[in-house]
Regions:
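Bacterial N-terminal signal peptides
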Residues: 8-16
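Short aromatic-glycine motifs in intrinsically disordered, low-complexity regions
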Residues: 72-78, 125-132
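Edge beta-strand at a domain terminus
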Residues: 121-123, 129-145
Length: 145
């Protein structure tokens, strides 16, 4: 009986996540269009030199598969959107990632950015803003993998 109780508590304790469990943002995320609310593309987040970056892996709209960023500036101007790094230099700060920027390939605008993982790492709430975070908009991306 005592052996069964010990076994029960071991199984019970091992089923709870550790306090230090912190899901990684790395992986493929499905973006959702702000207007249609339909899946729009896939963005792969990856770590490089201690920061998180995001690259567009695919467009889910066949009409946008060969789209170029005509409104972008600098080295992104007139480059294919698929394959483009749109999120740069995001660093972990407490429970969020911040300090980097995100590009809107439709407008060519670059915004300051922050994001948090929610729902056990299955959702990524991305906020792009100018100046202060209150002056911006958020999107929720869904983990693909």
């Amino acid at each position: 009986m005592l052996r069964n109780c010990r076994l029960f508590f071991i199984v019970l304790l091992s089923s709870f996540p550790l306090n230090g469990f912190d899901p990684s943002p790395e992986g493929v995320w499905r973006t959702i269009d702000d207007n249609t609310h339909k899946p729009r593309g896939l963005v792969r987040l990856y770590e490089q030199d201690g920061a998180v970056f995001g690259k567009i892996e695919a467009s889910l709209d066949p009409k946008e598969a060969d789209q170029v960023c005509e409104r972008c500036s600098g080295d992104r101007k007139n480059k294919r959107v698929v394959g483009m790094v749109v999120m740069r230099n995001m660093k972990k700060r407490g429970s969020e990632y911040a300090g980097g920027d995100i590009l809107d390939p439709d407008t060519g605008q670059v915004y300051r950015c922050k994001f948090t993982l929610e729902d056990g790492g299955r959702k990524l709430v991305v906020r792009g803003f100018i100046g202060i975070s209150l002056l911006g908009r958020s999107q929720t991306w869904l983990r693909q993998e």
